[in-house]
Amino acid sequence: MIRRGDVYLADLSPVQGSEQGGVRPVVIIQNDTGNKYSPTVIVAAITGRINKAKIPTHVEIEKKKYKLDKDSVILLEQIRTLDKKRLKEKLTYLSDDKMKEVDNALMISLGLNAVAHQKN
């Protein structure tokens, strides 16, 4: 079963403009109920270009810890819904601590922490 925090190789083509494309790693960010019942899955793209600008929506992941080809960055500003058929091979699973970083970056990307601050 596909689980939140899994890292898969996925085919993101075709793309337009600045979208991440090709066959590349993605992290599953959809909840596990959706992962179980939906034919689609919500993912964030991962890039091996760690020289990309360090912005609050980026989460670094280490190649040794996660058995990747190179140190990488999860791009939480590059989220999209994919048909599960685009997922090719499971590569690894992110730790709970790393997923907390993903959640924080995702909240920033979606503007959810601004909403939380307005309610307090």
Swiss-Prot record:
<keyword id="KW-0540">Nuclease</keyword>
<keyword id="KW-0255">Endonuclease</keyword>
<dbReference type="GO" id="GO:0003723">
    <property type="term" value="F:RNA binding"/>
</dbReference>
<dbReference type="InterPro" id="IPR003477">
    <property type="entry name" value="PemK-like"/>
</dbReference>
<comment type="similarity">
    <text>Belongs to the PemK/MazF family.</text>
</comment>
<keyword id="KW-0378">Hydrolase</keyword>
<dbReference type="GO" id="GO:0003677">
    <property type="term" value="F:DNA binding"/>
</dbReference>
<dbReference type="GO" id="GO:0006402">
    <property type="term" value="P:mRNA catabolic process"/>
</dbReference>
<dbReference type="Pfam" id="PF02452">
    <property type="entry name" value="PemK_toxin"/>
</dbReference>
<dbReference type="GO" id="GO:0004521">
    <property type="term" value="F:RNA endonuclease activity"/>
</dbReference>
<comment type="subunit">
    <text>Homodimer. Forms a complex with MazE which inhibits the endoribonuclease activity of MazF.</text>
</comment>
<protein>
    <recommendedName>
        <fullName>Endoribonuclease MazF</fullName>
        <ecNumber>3.1.-.-</ecNumber>
    </recommendedName>
</protein>
<keyword id="KW-0694">RNA-binding</keyword>
<dbReference type="GO" id="GO:0016075">
    <property type="term" value="P:rRNA catabolic process"/>
</dbReference>
<comment type="function">
    <text>Toxic component of a type II toxin-antitoxin (TA) system, cannot be expressed in E.coli in the absence of cognate antitoxin MazE. Ribosome-independent, sequence-specific endoribonuclease that cleaves mRNA, thus inhibiting protein synthesis and inducing bacterial stasis; it cuts between the first and nucleotides of 5'-UACAU-3' in single-stranded RNA. Its endoribnuclease activity is neutralized by coexpression with cognate antitoxin MazE.</text>
</comment>
<dbReference type="InterPro" id="IPR011067">
    <property type="entry name" value="Plasmid_toxin/cell-grow_inhib"/>
</dbReference>
<keyword id="KW-1277">Toxin-antitoxin system</keyword>
